[in-house]
């Protein structure tokens, strides 16, 4: 344990104890097993101190309370009982805090998450700042875990069963006012008076009285029948969402129910036991690997060079992508944006799109009316290049047409500063071709966003051979400020995400042409863990977009990207997907149904012959094969980048950890065997690539751990 202490105890003149948390050499406070002895000693001292009026637990960090338990300590656990012991230790410490004979108040400013909230729940009262940085939640489920230090038992007893299930099963984070409304905190006040208000709670001199239970809560969780109904409904809804792929949700329901029926002591025992089991599960290991990867990536700059300052962004094109890019630039990166479109309608649509998103935040009380107006004032636009001479980065989001994009480069070189970076949001065109006629090719880079931009977390940064290191560093820094996770990929057709997606989509078309029903194919991949099935995805992206991308991949990467002739048949029948109201499905508002006339159009007689598992593997194996080729061709820099790209870019099942983690878990020898079986049965497109064969033959893995 470090010599510096994480917990600082002071007793003031009024006999109020102040426990300040300040984890040494860390920006954020996190709870670590190494602090256990220190905490035990402090709680023993507090228990034995006579005449104390109360205790206030607060943070000595300027911007966070406790961001959770340090997830790294779980990696040292080799068995479920070891992980269970960690949970029991946390439970015992928080129980000691709860058992102190005087009022204990948590004064919360900034993130109060996971173990941090469990610490606060063990206090009698909670007071938080109304600052936007204050967030409260139990996000353990997102790591494939459950709250292991009493959270599953204390929260339902504090705020009731239904709101607790919602918070613990989703891992959602509450803003301060919502936390007050739900009863998670007792007061929500300006940060300047936070500690004074905490003191007032101590001065009342009372421990927390038992919660008053509402009639609704009595009916729902107080009676065996009501409780049974709530848990049955919660299990049903959760299974619909997770399709049985996340064991943590099942454990959460079981542990909360057990605690309400058998009492808190037994509830805590089961909480610790299930926590230990979940720590050792493949799902949690995969989800934790994503957490560690994204944490690492936040520190990376993509280049050795220093990024240039970005004071203003220009956006070319007011369509869906341009509107989304302008939104994240203003809302997240907090830089003013100038939009240019060929028509005023295009600019107007982009502004309306932004207003709609900001207004949603106003309705949810995230933004005030004045803040909304202030955000909208950061956006302007027109049909000419006015103000583009002040832009530092221009992001182009026009149609996928090479000569049009080259013209955009020429226009920006003529109308912006010599050092202005031109970032193209192409999804398929090679960056070196877009930069071919540029006067300053070092300023040109690919910046591939995913739709809808304001929701999708990934961006691919694609330098071509002449892109400067400073340009790379600048767009990586900008993407991070926009709230994105950037991965730097090599300039080759399809880049990374679309390149691994193409064989997956092609195989779904092969399966369809073998008479498997459309909804059966989609369901098989949903059950595998994808957020949408491949046929639905094609409709969402647009059949016309797929038809444009595939020939580019075939031309540059070879015949293995040639899919069945489905696109042209659909497009000739006016089926572009959701945007045209019909594709493989028909769309009426939010409802979609399989358009059975597609079968006739494609001369098919739908009949289910394949198992769900075979359908899923047939789609996924070509994707895995292509991911390995991308790694060996230098398209991605590491298996980690490949995993994050696939999860954040196309929704590869997070509980599998990404294509490379999944291959390690599957076993490379077994994977090669399965691919060879499929190659024999369905064709050479399943033949394992050289990189897979070599690694399998040498007994190597993609990851060491």
UniProtKB/Swiss-Prot annotation:
It is found in: Cytoplasm. PROSITE patterns: 3HCDH, ENOYL_COA_HYDRATASE. GO terms for cellular component: cytoplasm. Catalyzes the formation of a hydroxyacyl-CoA by addition of water on enoyl-CoA. Also exhibits 3-hydroxyacyl-CoA epimerase and 3-hydroxyacyl-CoA dehydrogenase activities. In the N-terminal section; belongs to the enoyl-CoA hydratase/isomerase family. Heterotetramer of two alpha chains (FadJ) and two beta chains (FadI). Pfam families: 3HCDH, 3HCDH_N, ECH_1. This is Fatty acid oxidation complex subunit alpha. It catalyses: a (3S)-3-hydroxyacyl-CoA = a (2E)-enoyl-CoA + H2O; a 4-saturated-(3S)-3-hydroxyacyl-CoA = a (3E)-enoyl-CoA + H2O; a (3S)-3-hydroxyacyl-CoA + NAD(+) = a 3-oxoacyl-CoA + NADH + H(+); (3S)-3-hydroxybutanoyl-CoA = (3R)-3-hydroxybutanoyl-CoA. One of its GO terms (molecular function) is enoyl-CoA hydratase activity. One of its GO terms (biological process) is fatty acid beta-oxidation. Pathway: Lipid metabolism; fatty acid beta-oxidation. The record marks 118, 140 as: Important for catalytic activity. Keywords: Cytoplasm, Fatty acid metabolism, Isomerase, Lipid degradation, Lipid metabolism, Lyase, Multifunctional enzyme, NAD, Oxidoreductase.
């Amino acid at each position: 344990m470090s010599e510096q202490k994480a917990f600082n105890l002071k007793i003031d003149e009024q006999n109020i104890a102040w426990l300040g948390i300040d984890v040494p050499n860390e920006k954020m406070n996190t709870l670590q097993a190494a602090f256990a002895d220190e905490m035990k000693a402090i709680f023993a001292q507090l228990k034995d101190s006579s005449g104390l009026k109360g205790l206030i637990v607060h943070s000595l960090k300027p911007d966070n309370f406790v961001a959770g338990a340090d997830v790294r300590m779980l990696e040292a656990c080799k068995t479920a009982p070891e992980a269970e012991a960690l949970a029991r230790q946390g439970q015992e410490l928080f129980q000691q805090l709860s058992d102190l004979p005087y009022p204990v108040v948590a004064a919360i400013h900034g993130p109060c998450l996971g173990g941090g909230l469990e610490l606060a729940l063990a206090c009698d009262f909670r007071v938080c700042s109304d600052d936007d940085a204050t967030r409260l939640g139990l996000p353990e489920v997102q790591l494939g875990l459950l709250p292991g230090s009493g959270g599953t038992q204390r929260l339902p007893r504090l705020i009731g069963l239904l709101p607790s299930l919602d918070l613990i099963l989703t891992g959602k984070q509450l803003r301060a006012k919502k936390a007050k409304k739900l009863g998670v905190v007792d007061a929500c006040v300006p940060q300047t008076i936070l500690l004074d208000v905490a003191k007032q709670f101590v001065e009342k001199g009372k421990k927390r009285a038992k919660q008053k239970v509402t009639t609704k809560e009595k009916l729902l969780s107080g009676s065996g029948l009501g409780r049974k109904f709530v848990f049955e409904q919660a299990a049903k809804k959760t299974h619909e969402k997770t399709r049985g792929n996340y064991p943590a949700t099942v454990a959460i329901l079981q542990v909360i129910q057990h605690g309400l029926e058998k009492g808190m002591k037994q509830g805590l025992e089961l909480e610790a036991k299930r926590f230990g089991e979940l720590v050792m599960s493949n799902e949690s290991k995969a989800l934790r690997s994503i957490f560690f990867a994204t944490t690492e990536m936040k520190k990376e700059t993509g280049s050795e060079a220093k990024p240039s300052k970005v004071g203003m962004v220009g956006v070319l094109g007011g369509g869906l992508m341009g509107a989304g890019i302008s939104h994240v630039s203003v809302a997240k990166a907090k830089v003013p944006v100038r939009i240019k479109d060929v028509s005023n309608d295009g600019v107007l649509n982009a502004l309306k799109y932004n207003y709609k998103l900001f207004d949603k935040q106003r309705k949810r009380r995230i933004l005030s009316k004045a803040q909304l107006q202030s955000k909208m004032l950061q956006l302007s636009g027109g049909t000419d290049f006015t103000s583009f001479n002040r832009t530092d980065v221009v992001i182009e989001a026009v149609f996928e047409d090479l000569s049009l994009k080259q013209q955009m480069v020429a226009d920006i070189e003529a109308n912006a500063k010599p050092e202005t970076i031109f970032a193209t949001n192409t999804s398929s065109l090679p960056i070196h071709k877009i930069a071919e006629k540029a006067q300053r090719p070092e300023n040109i880079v690919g910046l591939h966003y995913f739709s809808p931009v304001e929701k999708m977390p990934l961006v691919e940064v694609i330098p071509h051979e002449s892109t400067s290191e400073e340009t790379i560093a600048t767009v990586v820094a900008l993407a991070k400020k926009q709230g994105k996770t950037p991965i730097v990929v090599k300039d080759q057709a399809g880049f990374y995400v679309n390149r691994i997606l193409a064989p997956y989509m092609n195989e779904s078309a092969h399966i369809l042409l073998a008479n498997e029903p459309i909804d059966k194919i989609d369901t098989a991949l949903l059950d595998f863990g994808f957020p949408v099935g491949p046929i639905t995805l094609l409709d969402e992206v647009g059949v016309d977009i797929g038809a444009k991308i595939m020939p580019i991949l075939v031309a540059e990467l070879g015949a293995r990207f040639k899919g069945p002739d489905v696109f042209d048949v659909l497009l000739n029948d006016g089926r572009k997907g959701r945007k045209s109201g019909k594709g493989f499905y028909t769309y009426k508002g939010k409802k979609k149904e399989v358009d059975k006339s597609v079968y006739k159009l494609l001369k098919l007689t739908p009949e289910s012959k394949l198992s769900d598992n075979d359908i899923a593997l047939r789609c996924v194996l070509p994707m895995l094969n292509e991911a390995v080729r991308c790694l060996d061709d230098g398209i991605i820099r590491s298996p980690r980048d490949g995993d994050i790209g696939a999860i954040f870019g196309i929704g590869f099942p997070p509980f599998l950890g990404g294509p490379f983690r999944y291959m390690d878990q599957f076993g490379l020898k077994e994977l090669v065997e399965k691919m060879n079986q499929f190659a024999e049965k369905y064709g050479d497109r399943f033949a394992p690539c050289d990189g897979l064969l070599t690694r399998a033959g040498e007994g190597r893995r993609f990851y060491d751990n």
